[in-house]
UniProtKB/Swiss-Prot annotation:
Enzyme Commission number(s) of this protein: 4.3.2.1
An example Gene Ontology molecular-function term: argininosuccinate lyase activity
Protein known as: Argininosuccinate lyase
Organism in which the protein naturally occurs: Pseudomonas entomophila (strain L48)
Keywords, alphabetical: Amino-acid biosynthesis, Arginine biosynthesis, Cytoplasm, Lyase
Pathway as given in its UniProt record: Amino-acid biosynthesis; L-arginine biosynthesis; L-arginine from L-ornithine and carbamoyl phosphate: step 3/3
GO CC, one annotated term: cytosol
Family: Belongs to the lyase 1 family. Argininosuccinate lyase subfamily.
Amino acid sequence: MSTDKTNQSWGGRFSEPVDAFVARFTASVDFDKRLYRHDIMGSIAHATMLAQVGVLNDKERDTIIDGLKTIQGEIEAGNFDWRVDLEDVHMNIEARLTDRIGITGKKLHTGRSRNDQVATDIRLWLRDEIDIILGEITRLQQGLLEQAEREAETIMPGFTHLQTAQPVTFGHHLLAWFEMLSRDYERLVDCRKRANRMPLGSAALAGTTYPIDRELTCKLLGFEAVAGNSLDGVSDRDFAIEFCAAASIAMMHLSRFSEELVLWTSAQFQFIDLPDRFCTGSSIMPQKKNPDVPELVRGKTGRVFGALTGLLTLMKGQPLAYNKDNQEDKEPLFDAADTLRDSLRAFADMIPAIKPKHAIMREAALRGFSTATDLADYLVRRGLPFRDCHEIVGHAVKYGVDTGKDLAEMSLDELRQFSDQIEQDVFAVLTLEGSVNARNHIGGTAPAQVRAAVARGKALLASR
């Protein structure tokens, strides 16, 4: 049976064309065509290897490679006719290659299946995407370090349960996000190592009878290692799941950061101002300046969580080896990578432009008895057990609530009614500056420690 009657490369087994709706339903070219560059890269390496082992002659190799490069140019110029009836990016490129160079184009697929071809393409694509994302994480971290250095002495309230807890510096707070992003960076670097293993040569599932040189192809494509089992090579999507897991954690961090930015820009907090270019207005309320960028990042986080759940669900019931189910791996993976990359880019642009409102931050830190723990620590240094100190300060705070006075606003006589161990020097520890400066250890909020942490952060980024 001629393949012309079915319009498919695999049509020899079939006696009628695929139903038109089924062709549209099963086609993936609308979304997997973004793999074209990596598909061509893999094909060039495959053709090079086939010539090296004698399956192709040098002229055939060169003709194929020239044809593939021409096709890449057509695609990038917008002159390529993507055909749904050819199913996917692989068959579209192969069909166009055969149109251009004739029967030699049909030799390219020797020793290869679309199963190992697509697995290779996705890994090549993801490897590049991770590199871009790592660059955006670094750019965001650079912005955080710059802000933290500027704001090393800016005091704001630290919160637990969204209630005022203790004074911290704004620089210290920003560096918490730097630490989270460092872990995200490490996870993605680790994920990239496992994505960077080459399945090409696994063929459909059992390998191939041709004398292929997988080590050569591996070297040409820059993979770190060859997949060690052909069944696993074509069916493994762990790397995609692992990426989506790492992306989900990174997006969770950005979502938490977004929530703080939304709160801080509100009229109730007014801690920071976002430049107009990162905000939008209201169609009905003229006064509104909405923090749409952090809100949207917070909302998009659910998409990435969904991609992870979708891929886990996709894979959980599949027997070895390749199944058509795996066509559904690309859209969630693509979307997760796009969403994380764009969210990081938005934050990397926005964070250096944040303008903190120093006076409002400081005034907020003065509310809520934020130096209560410092008073308890003062009494401990006077020889009292911490639990007794905790209770003493609790009584003092209750008195402050009843009288409308912060601890630092009380007179010495007022404070001494709770403990005769309190002396005039107590007021040095009840100031905001005294509180933050007292926490002068690695990881603490003291300005000196913030500057030291910034220096360590700069060294870390320089080492990448």
